[in-house]
């Protein structure tokens, strides 16, 4: 058998795999668009597609009914939908990256302490500085998340085992426990902080305007760019540090850029929405099942899946207790816990 005869089936197989992945990305984009339209229509007051269109594009009109529809769509549901998509992309990509860099199949973005850092910053801002609005404490939350990520990375980079994924995980766990204890102590001593933290911790995309979404999206976009830059080296790191080093990868630089990307993505999303557990863990596993271990495909899939899942969970939360609402962070946790248990039971953990 000639070499050419062997190469042709392999080439056809690679082409077919690429075609399936492209089709899959297109399907996810289509599902996301349908979900966005549904998100604009579903709520305490259901809107028809025609009313959604009017709410988006109709010119200002003295008609009270049309004015009410415009207010619902443009002021409430459009920002909510955009934030669900942006935060879902950030948490999905962050989940895929953290599993890759730690080679830990059950790692989530909370491993870097960003959730506990953001929570600590929120209660500090409310209790010490008297912050009352999301626009005020969202920036404190982002700074807290970023600071926690820096501390975790710094602790994991010194002493014996520096740069080891296990050291990173242990440092993250230590910082998380410490900040969680501090957060609880402050919240229990200040009723206003406790009430604000209780609602923020549920994980919600409601009540946040474009004055917050716009700046947060800039940090998320920066994180996405850094994530895309690291994908080739992340594929090589997946083969092991020694192999990657032999192929010319600057391991320290790659991990540093990756951790910065994860901190930007998870920190900004958590600051805007509150902590949303299990999302990054779930979508990274689903993306790996659909695409295989190639991070050039896995990361885009994880981002789109994160957006779809968070958007769908937000819609479900509006429907199940209508006319009330269930925060999407709660719905994601209700889905994520059984998913995690199923992974454990079936032994589906694969090295990231």
Sequence positions of predicted segments:
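Alpha-helical transmembrane segments in inner-membrane proteins
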Residues: 2-352
């Amino acid at each position: 058998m000639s070499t050419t005869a062997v190469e042709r089936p392999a080439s056809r197989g690679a082409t077919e795999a690429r075609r399936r992945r492209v089709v899959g990305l297109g399907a996810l984009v289509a599902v996301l668009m349908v979900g966005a339209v549904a998100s604009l229509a579903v709520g305490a007051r259901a809107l028809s597609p025609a009313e959604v269109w009017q709410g988006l594009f109709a010119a200002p009109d003295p008609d009270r009914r049309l004015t009410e529809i415009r207010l619902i769509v443009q002021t409430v549901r459009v920002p909510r939908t955009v934030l669900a998509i942006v935060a879902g992309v950030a948490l999905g990509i962050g989940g895929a990256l953290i599993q890759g860099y730690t080679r830990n199949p059950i790692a989530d973005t909370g491993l870097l302490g960003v959730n506990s850092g953001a929570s600590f910053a929120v209660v500090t801002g409310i209790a010490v500085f008297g912050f009352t609005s999301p626009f005020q404490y969202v920036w404190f939350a982002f700074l807290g998340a970023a600071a926690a990520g820096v501390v975790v990375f710094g602790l994991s980079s010194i002493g014996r085992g520096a740069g080891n994924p296990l050291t990173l995980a242990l440092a993250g766990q230590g910082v998380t426990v410490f900040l969680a204890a501090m957060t609880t102590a402050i919240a229990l001593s200040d009723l206003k902080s406790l009430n604000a933290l209780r609602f923020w911790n549920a994980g919600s995309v409601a009540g946040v305007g474009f004055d917050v979404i716009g700046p947060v999206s800039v940090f998320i976009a920066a994180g996405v760019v850094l994530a895309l830059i690291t994908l080739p080296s992340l594929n090589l790191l997946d083969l092991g540090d020694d192999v990657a080093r032999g192929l010319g990868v600057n391991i320290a630089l790659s991990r540093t850029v990756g951790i910065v990307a994860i901190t930007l993505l998870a920190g900004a999303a958590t600051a805007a929405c509150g902590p949303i557990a299990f999302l990054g863990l779930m979508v990274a596993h689903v993306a790996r099942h659909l695409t295989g271990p190639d991070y050039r495909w896995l990361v885009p899939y994880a981002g789109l899946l994160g957006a779809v899942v968070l958007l769908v969970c937000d819609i479900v939360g509006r429907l199940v207790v209508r006319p009330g609402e269930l925060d999407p962070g709660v719905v994601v946790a209700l889905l994520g816990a059984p998913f995690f248990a199923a992974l454990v039971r079936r032994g589906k953990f694969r090295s990231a």
